[in-house]
Structures are given as structure tokens and as C-alpha cells.
């Protein structure tokens, strides 16, 4: 279970356009409908290229995983319950969903000026999946610890991240030897890159060497 949870051997296509960062830098300064409408043709070109990138990566992931679908998130923000009424996101966000019912978790790529990262794991697990994760950790937490603390994994993906319950999840004692892991409501691993990394021609080679 632990191996399936965190393993991701991914190879990306060579590069993305640096115009992505230029566009979002300008949008962050002019986050209004008038400016966006004037620059929508430019956005559509970038959106199309990112979709092609996502579909290409989906094919590559399917060489060693089981990916059901790729999703590029909409640029329009839901401002109904937000104090921030700016209408547009200032980043591209995309996700690759693993094939159910046999596979869980997924992958996410975030493209924003000076905030580029790849993530894998469980961002919003449903109650059944979260229950299963906790049961597996309770049964053999050391297996999971060995995996996420292995030097070759940790040097790339860093520390386990995610929201936690304050004390102990229902059904588990506060003095459970694996309580530090059981408290997690999310299981996320992340690797960050610079703007230059994501558009560099050798980006795929750097990932291969990770």
C-alpha cells in the first residue's frame, strides 16, 4: 500500500513556453475582465499548449501507471464566498487522475511565476480511502516510514505534507505509536522547480535523474 501511495516515476516532454509566466505576471497586475478579454487569444494559445502537454504526460504516465484522465482546471475563480473578488486565477493547475476502482491518489502540476511544483499523493481523499490509509498505517506504520524516509525518495520529494486532525482520529488512541502519521487527513509529497527549470530543454533529463 505504501509503495502505491507515493511512487511516481514520471518523464515530462521537453519544455513549456516561458510565455506562460509572462502572461500570468501581467494578469496579476491587471486581474479584470477588460484586460483578460483583450488578451484572451494569447491565453487560448497557451491553454492549448498546456493541454497538449498534459495529454502527452498522461500517455507517458500510462507506461507505468494507470491514468484515467487528465484535467486542466479552469482559469475562472469561484468568488461567491471569497472576499477576494478578482475574477481569474494567476496560474495553470492540472491534474492526472488514476484509474478507479483499483488505483487511488493522483498527480498535480502547478505553474505560476516563481511558484512551480509537482505534487503526488492524496489531496482530498474520500472517507473510505482515508480510512484504508489509516488502517494500513496502523497495521504496519514502519513500512510507510521506511519508504518516505529513504534518502533517494526524501532528497527529491522532501517531507510528508498535509492537513492533520488536532489530536487523534476517531477510533485511534492518542498514544498509538503511529499517531503522528494517523493524524494526517492528506498525504502529499511535493518537489519545487524554478521558472527556468520548467522551460529548460533538459528538464526531462533532470527528472529522469531524480
Please give the residue ranges for each predicted region.
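Compact, glycine/acidic-enriched structural inserts
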Residues: 113-167
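Long, solvent-exposed, polar/charged low-complexity segments
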Residues: 9, 13-26, 33, 50-54, ...
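Short, flexible loop/turn elements at secondary-structure junctions
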Residues: 77-79, 98-100, 113, 122-124, ...
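A short, structural micro-pattern
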Residues: 69, 88, 103, 112-116, ...
Amino acid at each position: 500500500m505504501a509503495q502505491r501511495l507515493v511512487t511516481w516515476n514520471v518523464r515530462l516532454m521537453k519544455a513549456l513556453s516561458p510565455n506562460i509566466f509572462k502572461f500570468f505576471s501581467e494578469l496579476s497586475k491587471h486581474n479584470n475582465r477588460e484586460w483578460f478579454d483583450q488578451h484572451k487569444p494569447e491565453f487560448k494559445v497557451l491553454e492549448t499548449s498546456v493541454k497538449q502537454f498534459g495529454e502527452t504526460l498522461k500517455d507517458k504516465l500510462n507506461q507505468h501507471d494507470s491514468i484515467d484522465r487528465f484535467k486542466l482546471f479552469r482559469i475562472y475563480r469561484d468568488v461567491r464566498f471569497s472576499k477576494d473578488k478578482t475574477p481569474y486565477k494567476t496560474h495553470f493547475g492540472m491534474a492526472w487522475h488514476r484509474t478507479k476502482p483499483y488505483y487511488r491518489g493522483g498527480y498535480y502540476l502547478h505553474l505560476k511565476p516563481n511558484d512551480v511544483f509537482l505534487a503526488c499523493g492524496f489531496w482530498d481523499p474520500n472517507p473510505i480511502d482515508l480510512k484504508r490509509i489509516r488502517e494500513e498505517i496502523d497495521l504496519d506504520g514502519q513500512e510507510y516510514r521506511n519508504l518516505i524516509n529513504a534518502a533517494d525518495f526524501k532528497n527529491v520529494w522532501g517531507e510528508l505534507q498535509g492537513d492533520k486532525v488536532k489530536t487523534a482520529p476517531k477510533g485511534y488512541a492518542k498514544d498509538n505509536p503511529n499517531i503522528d502519521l494517523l493524524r494526517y487527513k492528506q498525504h502529499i509529497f511535493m518537489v519545487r522547480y524554478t521558472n527556468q527549470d520548467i522551460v529548460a530543454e533538459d528538464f526531462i533529463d533532470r527528472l529522469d535523474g531524480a
